[in-house]
């Protein structure tokens, strides 16, 4: 079941909050749409990183860019323990990161989040202004932890952007098992000096991806220092595969 809020027009991009109910969980989300026009249109799913949420600045900027420049529908949801699903009173990054580590270790966290995404996909595609167009996925760091298993089992996803993650931690075996099933084009973004995710584990995950159309872009700097130019490139990469002529003038 989906619950929709009123549409708000912000500088020519329509924005609408929603929530889906999944096995007793309430999963909040946000949808961005171009100013006008019916579907079907491509849909891009945005997965946020640990301690962040569906309205983190870089996600909002990317969602609005994909909606305004390419005419896409764009959806983001709060992962377990994040955003509107965080533990009451936990607002600082230290507490939120501790909550993430607990959730990352929880059996069933991946399956639950994949189910959350499936419910969000169905709710969004039921809208006349979205419809049954092709789907892309974009998610770095924790967005890759949950994104790889989703893309592996969702045949409607035709292109993916991953990064800032490797084969490590509690979900190492799950990602190693799911990555070979991914056949769509993939852009993988990595920070060369990332002190959180060692390069060797990054290369392991990249190599495990089953896609024959994949590329790894590396940049100097720490985990969160992805250049804005790379984010812009990732938007063009999604557009090239979802709607080759979108954004042309």
Predicted regions and their residues:
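Short beta-strand/loop motif that positions the catalytic acidic residue
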Residues: 182, 188-190
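C-terminal catalytic histidine-bearing segment of alpha/beta-hydrolase fold enzymes
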Residues: 211-249
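Short beta-strand element of the alpha/beta-hydrolase
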Residues: 39-49
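Acidic catalytic loop of the alpha/beta-hydrolase fold
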Residues: 192-197, 224-225
């Amino acid at each position: 079941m989906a619950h929709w809020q009123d549409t708000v027009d912000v500088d020519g991009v329509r924005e609408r909050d929603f929530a889906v109910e999944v096995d007793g969980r309430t999963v909040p989300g946000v949808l961005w749409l171009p100013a006008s026009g019916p579907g079907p249109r491509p849909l891009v799913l945005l997965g946020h990183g640990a301690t962040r949420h569906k309205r983190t600045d870089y996600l909002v900027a990317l969602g609005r860019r994909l909606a305004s420049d390419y005419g896409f529908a764009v959806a983001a949801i709060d992962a377990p323990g994040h955003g509107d699903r965080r533990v009451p009173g936990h607002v600082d990054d230290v507490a939120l990161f501790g909550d993430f580590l607990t959730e990352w270790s929880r059996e069933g966290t991946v399956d639950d989040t994949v189910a959350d995404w499936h419910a969000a996909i169905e709710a969004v595609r039921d809208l006349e202004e979205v419809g049954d167009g092709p789907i892309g996925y974009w998610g770095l760091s924790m967005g890759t932890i949950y994104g790889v298993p989703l893309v592996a089992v969702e045949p409607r996803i035709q292109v993916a952007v991953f990064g800032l993650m490797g084969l490590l931690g509690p979900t190492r075996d799950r990602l190693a098992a799911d990555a070979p099933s991914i056949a769509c084009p993939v852009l993988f973004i990595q920070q060369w000096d990332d002190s959180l995710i060692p390069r060797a584990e990054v290369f392991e995950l990249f190599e495990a991806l089953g896609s024959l159309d994949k590329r790894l872009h590396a940049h100097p700097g720490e985990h969160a220092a992805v250049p804005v130019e790379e984010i812009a490139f990732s938007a063009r990469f999604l557009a090239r595969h979802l709607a080759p002529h979108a954004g042309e003038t």
